Each structure stands twice: as structure tokens, then as C-alpha cells.
Amino acid sequence: VFMLVSHRARGESAREVGWRLDNFFEAARLLLPPMLIVTMLLVGVGWYEGTLDFGRWEGGQTIMGVPGLSLIWGVLQQYALQGFINRRAQVALGRGALSVLLVASLFALFHLPNPWLTFATFAGGLLWAWVYQRAPNILAVGLSHSLMTWVMISSVPPGAFHNLRVGFKYFG
């Protein structure tokens, strides 16, 4: 609710925030090469470790009941990260490296104390913030987030990301 009130107070339209389709393919074009490279690396790790399983989800659960929720969750996280935080970072620091670094750092901080997930979200945050600043499209970066999460979970050993736990749940 706070973000919606903030958008209204600043006079930001849904289109300006990134809820649009006219630049979806431009955003996808920017996202696709790094996504393919990371996917090949992660699938290679999964193949080498013998942990490759595209049906696996957190804690060994099947992914079959999760896709819709995962897609929504990725889009919502990217709305908060890009549509709100990135836009405010650009106001404070300008478009470019400093605001991209701030956005990626904040995204990583939200995933502490999980070390590998913090690293992965920093790397993903760099890509998504950079792409959003060039082609602001929440749906494209949100779908990318969801797909890369699925690839990561399906490829690396199940315990590597501690079942995606963050905060105090990481220790439980």
C-alpha cells in the first residue's frame, strides 16, 4: 500500500513504473544473453554434481504446484525492487552504476544471512536493475527472476541455498 501511495504522491503512472508491454521485447532482449550464460553454468553444475532436477523445488518438494505462485512472487519482488526502490535510487543518485549498485546491494541485504543466496541475489539484482533502467518493464524482469530462481533451485545441490531461507528462518 505504501508503494502505491508513494507512486500516487509522485504522480507516477503504472506505465512509468514499468507495468507495460510496449517495451517487453526490448527488456527480454537485454535479459536473454546473461540468463542463457548463467543457465548453462548452473545446469553444468547440476549435471556435474548429479543434482539436476527440473521437477524439484524448495526442500525437495515437487515444483508442480508452485509455478503460478513463483511467477507472481518474482513479479512482486521485482515491482518492489525496480518499480519502487530503483526509481527512488535514480532520483537520488541518477541513472547508472551507482543506483544499480545500490539496488543490487539492497536486494542482496534482504537475503542475509544466507551467503550463497545473498551472492546470487546481488548478481541478479545488478542485471535486473541495469535492464530496468534501460527498458522499464516489471513483467520482463519479474519473469526473469522467476525463471532464474527455478533454474537455480533445479540445478545446484538442494542444501546450497539452504532452501532459500533468509532472516531468522535461516537458522531454524
Residue ranges of predicted features:
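Hydrophobic alpha-helical transmembrane segments
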Residues: 28-32, 63-67, 97-102, 118-122, ...
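Aromatic-anchored segments of alpha-helical transmembrane domains
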Residues: 38-48, 104-113, 146-156
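Juxtamembrane helix-loop-helix connectors linking adjacent transmembrane helices
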Residues: 11-76, 86-87, 91-92, 162-172
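Membrane-interface helix/loop boundary segments of multi-pass membrane proteins
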Residues: 79-102, 130-137
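Alpha-helical transmembrane segments in multi-pass membrane proteins
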Residues: 1-10, 30
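Functionally important transmembrane alpha-helices
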Residues: 118-172
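Hydrophobic, membrane-inserted alpha-helices
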Residues: 100-109, 124-128
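Membrane-embedded alpha-helical segments of multi-pass membrane proteins
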Residues: 1, 63-68, 76, 80, ...
